[in-house]
A protein has these predicted regions:
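Transmembrane helical bundles and short interhelical boundary loops of multi-pass, membrane-embedded
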Residues: 310-312
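Membrane-integral, polyisoprenol-dependent glycosyltransferases
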Residues: 4-8, 12-306
C-alpha cells in the first residue's frame, strides 16, 4: 500500500503524452490512452526500416519491419496503455542514432539520440540511458576504437541526456521528498541489486528465454518448422577449432549485423542479472531479432521454400 501511493508520484512522460492527445481529442478515453504506444511503435518501425534499408537492403528491411510490427509481444505493447512501448521506441531509436554517430567517427553531438535518451529516462529511469550508450560503446571498442575516446564521448552523451530528467527529478523531489527518493532508489538501484524491500516479478534466468520464444509467436513456429527442412552435417574438429572459427566469423561480420547482434546479447544479458524479470523488459531486442529473422526467411526462400509453404 505505501509503495502504491508512492508510485502515483512517478508521472511518466507517456502519461503526459496521453494528456496532450486527450486535450486535442477533448476527452480521456481508451483510444487516446493507447495512442502514445501506437505512435511510438509506428515511429520505431519506420526508423528501423530506414536504418536497415540503407545498410542491408530494402527487402530485408521491409521484412524486418513487418516482423517487428506483427509479433505477439510487440503488437501487444503497441496497443496497450502502458509505458513499455514508449520506452522501447526511445531506446531503439537512440540505438540507431548512436550507430550513425559512430559512423561519423563520433564527431558533433547526436542531438536526436540525446533527446530519445532523455525521453527514455523520463519513461522508466536511468536504464533508458545506460543500455543505449553501453551497446554502441562496446561495438566501437570491438571495432578497434580507442577506449578513452569512446568512454568520454558517451559520457558526454549521457550527461546531456540527464539534463531534462534531472530537472523533472528535482521538481518531483521537491514535491515528494524522501518518499520519492526512496522510490527512485528502490526501482532503479535495489531492483538491479536484488535488494528490494518487496517481491517484484521475481523469475529465474530461463524465464527470459521462454518469454522471447513465446513473445515472437507466430514466427517461432516458423523456426521450428524450418528445422525439419535444413541439412545437417556431423561436427568435425575440436572445440578450439570451432571457437577460432566463431571468433573469425564475428570479426568479419558486417558492421550493421554485428551491431544488431550486440544489441540482442547485451540487453538480454543485462536483464538476466536482476531477480525482477518481465517479458516487456526485453522489448528493445525484438527489432534486432526481426532483422536476423528476416535474413533467415530470405535464406529459406532461396534454399528451403517448402518450409515457408508449410508455415503458411
Amino acid at each position: 500500500e505505501p509503495y502504491r501511493r508512492q508510485r502515483q508520484m512517478c508521472i511518466r512522460d507517456s502519461h503526459w503524452c496521453i494528456a496532450a492527445i486527450s486535450t486535442v481529442a477533448g476527452a480521456v478515453n481508451e483510444y487516446t490512452s493507447r495512442m502514445p504506444s501506437a505512435l511510438a511503435l509506428s515511429a520505431m518501425v519506420l526508423v528501423g526500416y530506414v536504418f536497415y534499408a540503407k545498410r542491408r537492403g530494402a527487402e530485408v528491411a521491409f521484412i524486418a519491419a513487418l516482423l517487428t510490427l506483427t509479433n505477439f509481444e510487440v503488437h501487444r505493447a503497441g496497443v496497450a496503455c502502458r509505458v513499455d512501448m514508449v520506452l522501447t521506441a526511445m531506446m531503439v531509436i537512440a540505438l540507431y542514432q548512436l550507430y550513425k554517430w559512430g559512423e561519423k567517427d563520433l564527431k558533433g553531438v547526436p542531438w536526436v539520440a540525446v533527446l530519445c535518451l532523455s525521453a527514455a529516462a523520463l519513461t522508466k529511469g536511468p536504464v533508458g540511458i545506460v543500455l543505449p550508450c553501453l551497446v554502441p560503446a562496446v561495438f566501437l571498442w570491438i571495432r578497434g576504437r580507442k577506449f578513452l575516446r569512446i568512454f568520454f564521448s558517451f559520457l558526454m552523451v549521457a550527461v546531456l541526456a540527464c539534463v531534462l530528467p534531472a530537472v523533472w527529478y528535482w521538481a518531483a523531489y521537491q514535491q515528494g521528498g524522501d518518499h520519492f527518493l526512496d522510490l527512485v532508489l528502490e526501482e532503479n538501484v535495489y531492483r538491479f541489486l536484488g535488494k528490494m524491500t518487496y517481491a517484484s516479478h521475481e523469475n529465474p534466468a530461463w524465464y527470459n528465454v521462454m518469454t522471447v520464444v513465446a513473445g515472437y509467436a507466430p514466427y517461432t513456429l516458423l523456426g521450428l518448422v524450418s528445422l525439419f527442412f535444413l541439412r545437417y552435417r556431423k561436427p568435425q574438429g575440436r572445440v578450439r577449432t570451432w571457437w577460432s572459427r566463431f571468433v573469425a566469423y564475428i570479426r568479419n561480420m558486417d558492421d550493421a549485423r554485428l551491431y544488431s547482434l550486440l544489441c540482442i546479447v547485451i540487453i538480454f544479458t543485462f536483464y538476466c542479472i536482476p531477480k525482477s524479470k518481465r517479458s516487456v523488459y526485453l522489448l528493445p531486442i525484438y527489432p534486432f531479432i526481426a532483422y536476423f529473422l528476416a535474413e533467415y526467411i530470405i535464406y529459406l526462400r532461396h534454399r528451403h521454400l517448402n518450409a515457408l509453404r508449410v508455415f503458411g
